[in-house]
Amino acid sequence: MSSAFKPVITQAGITAVFNATNSGLEANIVAVALGDQSWSPTSAATKLKKEKRRIPVGNGNKLSPNQIHITAIEDGQQQAYWVREVGFYLEDGTLLAVWSHPSQPLAYKAPGVDLLLAFDVALSALPRSLIQI
């Protein structure tokens, strides 16, 4: 059994979510960014350290009020790289959440092979029902 994917929620992401909901809008996660730089993200992050590719969310649904399931396919790169950082971007381009580990990669993207990504993302730092996919 896998554990929930727990990225760091960014301050910019929290601000964008609250601005959207105060305007009567929803904050929509529309893209997943992949990078190959290992680091220890903080809430001050506004972008990945070394983004390789930004891909649209393929599918998503809410598992609970503060947990979502997101899928995406990285199929455009012919270059090989280790996925060491992941970012979740809102419709307005704001980085909502970021994950990285200083020493452990998440996956490997081989040239000419699609990489199917599926994330169960815990967003417990955000109030219920503010995020859509």
Model-derived features with residue positions:
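N-terminal assembly/attachment segments of tailed bacteriophage virion structural proteins
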Residues: 1-133
